[in-house]
Amino acid sequence: MKTFSPTPENINREWFVVDASDLVLGRLATQITHRLRGKHKPEFAPHMDNGDFIVVVNCEKIKVTGNKLADKKYYRHSGYVGGLHEITLEKLLASHPERVLMNAVRGMLPKNRLGRAMLKKLKVYAGPEHPHAAQNPQPLAIKY
């Protein structure tokens, strides 16, 4: 018997919707990353993108533990001298709640072309509405 190696024809992607209301950020991000990579499937291969599509709604109602709202900071640099910008988690949740979950999931994915392709399958929305009803996403229960 030969070792099975999946090909692009073997990939079967499904759509799932996750309600992020009152879920902890890091625990939710790990479950989403697991699904995006396809590690829940028996035909998982680390060199292929065989994960599912994930739609996350109500991202503005996400929770964090401890004092992270005030203490956690996100940094970016413009490339110019003195161009370091920082924003706290509390301000980022108030202005762009989708970016909080996207940043958390991005940090857990591979840092290469494959990781960027996996991240494109994640759709995050602040409110309860999403435009992916035509794909008939199944509700995904997050367990932790």
From Swiss-Prot:
The keyword Cytoplasm does not apply. The keyword Zinc does not apply. One of its GO terms (cellular component) is cytosolic large ribosomal subunit. GO terms for biological process: negative regulation of translation; translation. One of its GO terms (molecular function) is structural constituent of ribosome. Keywords: Ribonucleoprotein, Ribosomal protein. Pfam families: Ribosomal_L13. This protein is one of the early assembly proteins of the 50S ribosomal subunit, although it is not seen to bind rRNA by itself. It is important during the early stages of 50S assembly. Belongs to the universal ribosomal protein uL13 family. Part of the 50S ribosomal subunit. HAMAP family: Ribosomal_uL13. This is Large ribosomal subunit protein uL13.
